[in-house]
Amino acid sequence: MDLLAINSAATLFVSGEIDDWAPVRERGIDTIVDMDGTVDPGLSEAPNQVLYVYWPILDEDLPCLPRLEVLGRLVADLVGTDHRVLVHCRLGFNRSVLVIATALTHLGMSGEQALRHLRQLRPGALFNETFAEHVRALPARRIRVEVV
């Protein structure tokens, strides 16, 4: 499994399918967002108290945009409160990167900046042009995380 840190704080990661839970445990990941069509094999080996979000989408047309926004905001909120989040799909290039790019816009990057950043870290990312065009059009937004 190729686990790649997206931010310098190493709180946001992308990967393909999880086939080894050791890197997840080693990096202290406490939230997994699974975009693939199958539940991860060996899920019972996941670290205790990991939040597992399962939202399978096809690597074709854009998913339901309001739900994509909610998921992007959730990832941004978690990263903004020092959780360690892994977003993954089968290969870690399109669906997972779409969600991460959406989250990055909620953390203040424009869609174009997010796309450039993600492609620099992961060459070939967002080769689904429908997804890439959507990301390019996203404005920079800054969430305000409130911890009660």
Task: Label each region the model flagged.
Residues D2-R84, T105-H134:
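Cysteine-based protein phosphatase catalytic domain of the PTP/DSP
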Residues L78, D82-A101:
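A phosphate-binding catalytic loop at a beta-strand-loop-alpha-helix junction
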Residues F127-V148:
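Charged C-terminal helix
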